[in-house]
């Protein structure tokens, strides 16, 4: 049976059981920051299991694309060396959202794998495991499905309690195993069993997870609705159905192996270094093909970096097969041929996929040879010294200089009998990150800038053109590392670049430095910040993403236009805020500091005491009126004395030159000395909203605010918080209601015993009459029944006052008193005293009353009324 047939049969089977076929979701999780990649079939249903999303169906079946590489679920190092590890794989799954649970889920699984109509596996080669305390699962497997008890294995939390990650839906699970046969048994001293050795004789292929909880940072929280999440690995199932030992021997891999054979001239024979290379290349080519199809691109962070590690590992293994030129992009064509019917996006996007792969291969091959030579030198030196562990520092240099991920160093070391000091590597990496962080500290920057300034003596300052341009040509005057040493820089290097001209605004006047790119043919640098030396040289802090950077290169500097525009809105809004505060609070208000960023603004000002809500509203109203008036924003340069004569506000303590830049709003409504970037008209700010006003000490207040799209984000976040608070309140109310019911039940139970103990005897008949702490007629009947049962023989009359101020009454008579005491007649007389009426059967009757103040009198009359019916 082919893999495609297994996939289709699975979908068809569960569709016959009322499941809706839901297409595979993207490998890039939607709106889930807890996941790097989609790594299980249930990822796309996470919000459904949590009760945050409601779907039109309660049963679903999927064939889901998954990747496990990076993060908690990371199989990368094992791929190629074991029979069943892959980075990309397919997970077949059936799901229940508050519909069926364990009994149906396990019965469906057994039917699919054993029925001749579907897979038809022999039952005597199947075993199951359950969570050690899951008696319900044992009962279903043994008593309902018919699995012998000695084939049901109990395992602990590590094996049979499933969690998607550190947070999210989870619960106990039950796995199904295939016995490869006694000829594959190991020699474990306690015997070869699932619960002793877990060796490759036992092939787990289907996991049934019973979603009962949500794992939060605080602990397990029961889900409102239980659910079922199952995962059947397609590759493992195909291994069983096709009668082969290894996942690599199934039909999905053979066309890909054939393509590698065609390109390399080598043959896949299952064992040895070349076989490992075949498997690594095939797996990693398939994984990268699907990731690129789903929009992931190679980069130095996040998903893109993990994909880069995967591809570079494959390229390195390509050397084992003799590849010296890009080749994985050609293997991707075979992947599309094999997988394109099930996943058409791979075939449709193949040109883009191959182009991305080819360019990334070319980029890495430029440094691979040098890096491998350096690694061989390290290994040769170690052999001479009799050492077996590659130092963490050496491994880090291979990464930092040649772009070798730790995976590659580890693989080469393993092949030649060496290991890697991974702790030392991580320490070197942490040290570099600490240096990068320190490079942002003022004290460190002063030292670094001093060193850089020494190198730049006699070099003309950078010409800033960013007021009118967001992109422009420039020449590289100098390149420094994070410690201020002059250098050239290759891919992955953190650098500080000085250009002869730039559109990048350097941090100053509260405005953050621009971000963007510096590019040239074969070169791309991501600029993360821009600062300025007192000498006027702009320092562009960034990371080389592609190519090699050196002095003298002609480059194009490109500012991130969206971020700059948002920053300009916030900077103009800061000027409007300053003016409005002086209008509303008084001219004593002076700017004491500010932060102008793309997503927000912060303004510190002198003022004693908090602003009132009315003052905050007045400031907002004044600013938004200026925005709506669409006033022009202009700037001009003039002598400092002239600017002061015009009334331009200056920042206290700031140093200004003889010629200053004055930014004006409208016809001088606001006029400030400012070297920052602004919109050309107040209407571009769109809207202004104050988020908070607080004191930061010493008679200085702080306002935080947003403009334009930031206001929309703020409102959306506020709405989300309100919804969340509403949900939490609703949940808490439900909990309180439940707690109240429990308290009432406890009180009722206690009252029951007390009333029975205080029963009176009338003519030899036990009589109980009293009030009950219950809210409803149903609760009152239940309590009456409980007392009647405890009495064994007798009469019970209970009363309770409702929340509406009405009286509920119940009378009950034991069967042995039938014909002597009539409950309906008795309750009618009792109710009459309370201003009501009622009646009912001889053994049980209910009534109501309007006068709760007479309930005690009515209950006191019960013994006499019972005596009357007994003829006493």
Swiss-Prot record:
EC number: 6.1.1.7
Catalytic activity: tRNA(Ala) + L-alanine + ATP = L-alanyl-tRNA(Ala) + AMP + diphosphate
SUPFAM superfamilies in alphabetical order: Class II aaRS and biotin synthetases, Putative anticodon-binding domain of alanyl-tRNA synthetase (AlaRS), ThrRS/AlaRS common domain, Translation proteins
One Gene Ontology cellular component: cytosol
Matches recorded under Pfam families: DHHA1 (PF02272), tRNA-synt_2c (PF01411), tRNA_SAD (PF07973)
Main EC class the enzyme belongs to: ligase
Compartment(s) where it occurs, according to its Swiss-Prot or TrEMBL record: Cytoplasm
PROSITE patterns named among the record's database cross-references: AA_TRNA_LIGASE_II_ALA (PS50860)
Binding site for Zn(2+): 571, 575, 674, 678
Keywords: Aminoacyl-tRNA synthetase, ATP-binding, Cytoplasm, Ligase, Metal-binding, Nucleotide-binding, Protein biosynthesis, RNA-binding, tRNA-binding, Zinc
Family: Belongs to the class-II aminoacyl-tRNA synthetase family.
Record-given protein name: Alanine--tRNA ligase
The organism of origin for this protein: Symbiobacterium thermophilum (strain DSM 24528 / JCM 14929 / IAM 14863 / T)
Gene from which this protein is expressed: alaS
């Amino acid at each position: 049976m082919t893999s495609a047939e297994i996939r289709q049969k699975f979908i068809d089977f569960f569709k016959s059981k009322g499941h809706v076929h839901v297409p595979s979701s993207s490998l890039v999780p939607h709106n889930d920051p807890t996941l790097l990649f989609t790594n299980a079939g249930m990822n796309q249903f996470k919000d459904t299991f949590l009760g945050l999303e409601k779907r039109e169906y309660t049963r679903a079946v999927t064939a889901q694309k998954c990747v496990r590489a990076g993060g908690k679920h990371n199989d990368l190092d094992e791929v190629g060396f074991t029979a069943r590890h892959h980075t990309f794989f397919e997970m077949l799954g059936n799901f229940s959202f508050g519909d069926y649970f364990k009994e149906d889920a396990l019965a469906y699984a057994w039917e699919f794998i054993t029925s001749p109509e579907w897979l038809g596996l022999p039952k005597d080669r199947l075993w199951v495991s359950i969570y050690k305390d899951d008696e319900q699962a044992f009962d279903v497997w043994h008593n309902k499905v018919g699995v012998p008890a000695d084939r049901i294995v109990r395992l602990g939390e590590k094996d049979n309690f499933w969690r998607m990650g550190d947070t999210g839906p989870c619960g106990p699970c039950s796995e199904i195993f295939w016995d490869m046969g006694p000829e594959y048994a190991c020699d474990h001293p306690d015997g070869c069993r699932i619960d002793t050795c877990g060796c490759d004789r036992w092939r787990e292929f289907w996991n049934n997870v019973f979603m009962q909880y949500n794992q939060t940072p605080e602990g397990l929280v029961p889900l409102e609705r239980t659910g079922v999440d199952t995962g059947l690995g397609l590759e493992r199932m195909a291994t069983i159905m096709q009668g082969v030992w290894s996942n690599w021997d199934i039909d999905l891999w053979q066309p890909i192996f054939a393509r590698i054979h065609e390109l390399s001239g080598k043959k896949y024979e299952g064992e040895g270094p070349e076989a490992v290379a075949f498997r690594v290349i095939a797996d990693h080519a398939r994984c990268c093909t699907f990731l690129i199809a789903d929009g992931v691109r190679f980069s130095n962070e996040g998903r893109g970096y993990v994909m880069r590690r995967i591809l570079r590992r494959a390229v390195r293994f390509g050397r084992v097969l003799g590849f010296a030129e890009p080749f994985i992009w050609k293997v991707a064509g075979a992947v599309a041929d094999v997988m394109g019917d099930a996943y058409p996006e791979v075939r449709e996007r193949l040109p883009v996929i191959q182009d991305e792969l080819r360019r990334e291969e070319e980029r890495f091959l430029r440094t691979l040879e040098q890096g491998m030579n350096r690694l061989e030198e390290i290994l040769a030196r170690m052999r001479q010294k009799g050492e077996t562990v590659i130092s963490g520092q050496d491994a880090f240099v291979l990464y930092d200089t040649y772009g070798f991920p730790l995976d590659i160093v580890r693989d080469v070391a393993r092949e030649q009998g060496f290991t890697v000091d991974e702790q030392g590597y991580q320490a070197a990496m942490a040290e570099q990150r600490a240096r990068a962080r320190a490079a942002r500290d003022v004290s460190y920057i002063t030292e670094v800038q001093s060193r850089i300034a020494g190198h730049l003596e006699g070099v003309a300052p950078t010409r800033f053109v960013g007021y009118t341009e967001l992109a422009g040509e420039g020449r590289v005057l100098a390149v420094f590392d994070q410690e201020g040493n002059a250098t050239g820089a290759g891919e992955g290097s953190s650098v500080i670049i000085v250009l002869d001209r730039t559109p990048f605004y350097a941090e100053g006047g509260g405005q953050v430095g621009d971000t963007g790119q510096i590019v040239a043919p074969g070169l791309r640098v991501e600029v993360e910040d821009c600062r300025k030396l007192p000498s006027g040289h702009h320092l562009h802090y960034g990371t080389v993403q592609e190519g090699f950077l050196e002095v003298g290169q002609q480059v194009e500097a490109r500012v991130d236009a969206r971020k700059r525009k948002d920053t300009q809105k916030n900077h103009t809004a800061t000027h409007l805020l300053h003016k409005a505060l002086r209008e509303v609070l008084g001219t004593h208000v002076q700017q004491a500091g500010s932060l102008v960023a793309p997503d927000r603004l912060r303004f510190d000002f002198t003022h004693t005491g908090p602003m009132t809500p009315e003052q905050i509203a007045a400031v907002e109203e004044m600013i938004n009126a200026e925005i709506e008036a669409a006033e022009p924003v202009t700037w001009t340069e003039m002598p400092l004395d002239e600017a002061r004569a015009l009334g331009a506000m200056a920042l206290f303590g700031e140093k200004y030159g003889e010629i200053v830049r004055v930014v004006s709003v409208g016809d001088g409504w606001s006029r400030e000395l400012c070297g920052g970037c602004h919109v050309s008209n107040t209407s571009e700010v769109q809207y202004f909203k104050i988020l908070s006003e607080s004191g930061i000490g010493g008679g200085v207040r702080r306002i935080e605010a947003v403009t334009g799209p930031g206001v929309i984000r703020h409102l959306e976040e506020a709405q989300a918080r309100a919804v969340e608070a509403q949900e939490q309140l609703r949940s808490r109310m439900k909990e309180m209601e439940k707690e109240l019911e429990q308290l009432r039940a406890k009180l009722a139970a206690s009252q029951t015993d007390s009333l029975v103990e205080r029963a009176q005897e009338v003519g030899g008949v036990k009589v109980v009459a009293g009030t009950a702490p219950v809210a409803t007629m149903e609760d009152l009947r239940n309590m009456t029944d409980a007392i009647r049962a405890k009495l064994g023989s007798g009469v019970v009359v209970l009363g309770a006052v409702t929340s509406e101020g009405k009286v509920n009454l119940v009378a009950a008579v034991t069967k042995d008193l039938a014909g002597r005491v009539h409950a309906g007649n008795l309750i009618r007389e009792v109710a009459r005293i309370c201003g009501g009426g009622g009646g009912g059967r001889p053994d049980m009757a209910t009534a109501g009353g309007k006068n709760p103040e007479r309930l005690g009198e009515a209950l006191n009359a019960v013994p006499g009324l019972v005596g009357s019916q007994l003829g006493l």
